[in-house]
Regions:
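C-terminal membrane-solvent junction of multi-pass transporters and transport-like membrane proteins
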Residues: 318-398, 402, 409-412
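Hydrophobic, small-residue-rich membrane helices and short re-entrant helix-turn-helix hairpins
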Residues: 97-110, 157, 174-206, 224-228, ...
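Membrane-interface loop-to-helix entry segments
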Residues: 34, 45, 51, 82-127, ...
Length: 413
């Protein structure tokens, strides 16, 4: 995050513009659209998840339960559709005034989720009669609950520990690309570092501990492994606590969605058509695409694998951009040239062929081979993002330095 963030602080440009330095003034539209496609898909998926938490809360009331059971359209129940549209609309309100509204929402949403999670944890610990970081959950139950996580090895082994760490790092792969969309507003690098330290390792570790304590206490109380606040809320006798749990999940999901899946495509679409689309219109396009996808609910089927395969190409793109910025350009970019069609970043007609060669080869090893062949070890896919970054970065460095060397020799001649 800091590597991309420093570039954002120094240049003050969003991700699709920074990508022009390595992929070309027109070629940068491809990595921008890759990020936008994945974001639109998950925008719909996260909106559906947040609305699902509200549905789980409302059907505790008999009238809503009857309505949910008796009405169906667009492949969903009537209540699911209404809640999805409401959550979808709320997200549009959040970005009404651009990035400033997003910042204000995050300032409120982050602490609110923490408060609600602590209340849930304290309530369940009191009800279970203990506060514990260790659990009596049977191993076969844990294995059943985590069978779809794609983590190789036995739970608790070094193999599974490294795999989980890799998955956590890869989880943020989309934000690694477009973090400069946010970092460009930071006053300096020191502020960026401080924010990332508190927001990522410290916040993530502490929140994981609270979530673990909550899950353990919920198992002690209800005899089930409940991994989501909306699942816990379904067990509460108190409507207030049920609402608290549902809102925790909904607000947390909205917070992630607005940052990870709204801001990025807003900038990406506006970059592709800068004269016709501004930030707000780009965000609206992403929201409409997510809404149109809802009747098909592709996130519930095999299409999710397709989008994950596309998402795996983010590693090679990241590798190319970081090698170009830090190793080739030494952190120095002519920002004005990023906005000129005939400047330094025109390369081959606006496309930097070497960058696409490197990213393409990296994508073969990070995405295509692990998902469509059995030529690689079964564990390769878990670390695919890392292989993509390394392979694409190395190839790009070799190709770019060779091209620069050839150019220098030609100039001397």
């Amino acid at each position: 995050m800091n590597m991309v963030g420093y570039a954002g602080v120094k240049t003050g440009v969003p991700y699709p513009v920074l990508a022009r330095a390595s992929f070309g003034i027109w070629g940068a539209n491809i990595p921008a659209l890759v990020r936008a496609v994945v974001a639109c898909f998950w925008y719909g998926a996260q909106t559906a998840a947040a609305s699902g938490a509200i549905v789980a809360l409302l059907i505790r009331t008999q009238w809503f339960a009857d309505f949910n059971a008796s009405t169906h359209f667009l492949g969903h129940t009537g209540l699911e559709v209404i809640c999805f549209v409401v959550i979808w609309g709320l997200q549009l309100l959040i970005i009404q005034n651009g990035m400033e509204t997003v910042r204000r929402f995050q300032d409120w949403a982050g602490p609110a989720v923490w408060v609600m999670m602590l209340i849930l944890a304290i309530y369940l610990c009191v009800k279970s009669g203990r506060f514990a970081f260790t659990s009596d959950i049977p191993m076969d139950v844990l294995l059943d609950k985590t069978k779809d996580a794609g983590v190789p090895g036995t739970p608790g082994s070094w193999t599974s520990l490294f795999a989980v760490a890799a998955i956590w790092v890869t989880y943020f792969s989309a934000l690694y690309l477009n973090f400069c969309d946010f970092a460009r507003y930071a006053p300096d690098k020191a502020s960026l570092r401080k924010g990332n330290i508190w927001g990522l390792p410290i916040n993530l570790i502490l929140f994981s501990l609270v979530a673990g304590v909550t899950t353990i206490a919920a198992f002690d109380v209800y005899g089930e492994v409940l991994l989501h606040p909306d699942q816990i809320s379904a067990k509460f006798d108190s409507w207030f606590l049920a609402a608290l749990a549902a809102l925790t999940f909904a607000v947390a999901t909205l917070g992630i969605n607005v940052v990870a899946n709204f801001v990025s495509p807003a900038f990406d679409f506006s970059n592709v058509f800068p004269r016709q689309i501004d930030f707000k219109k780009g965000g609206y396009i992403a929201a409409v695409i997510a809404l149109l996808l809802y009747p098909f609910a592709p996130w519930e089927g095999s299409a999710a694998s397709f989008v994950n395969i596309i998402g795996a190409t983010m590693g090679p793109i990241f590798g190319v951009m970081m090698v170009d910025y830090y190793l080739i350009r030494k952190g120095e970019v002519d920002v004005e040239a990023l906005y000129r069609e005939d400047g330094e970043f025109r390369f081959q007609g606006g496309w930097h062929v070497n960058a696409f060669i490197a990213a393409g080869i990296g994508a073969i090893f990070s995405s295509i081979l692990p998902n469509f062949t059995n030529w690689l070890p079964s564990w390769w896919g878990v670390y695919g993002w890392f292989f993509g970054v390394a392979i694409a970065g190395i190839i790009y460095y070799v190709l770019r330095t060779a091209a620069l060397g050839a150019g220098a020799r030609t100039a001397k001649a």
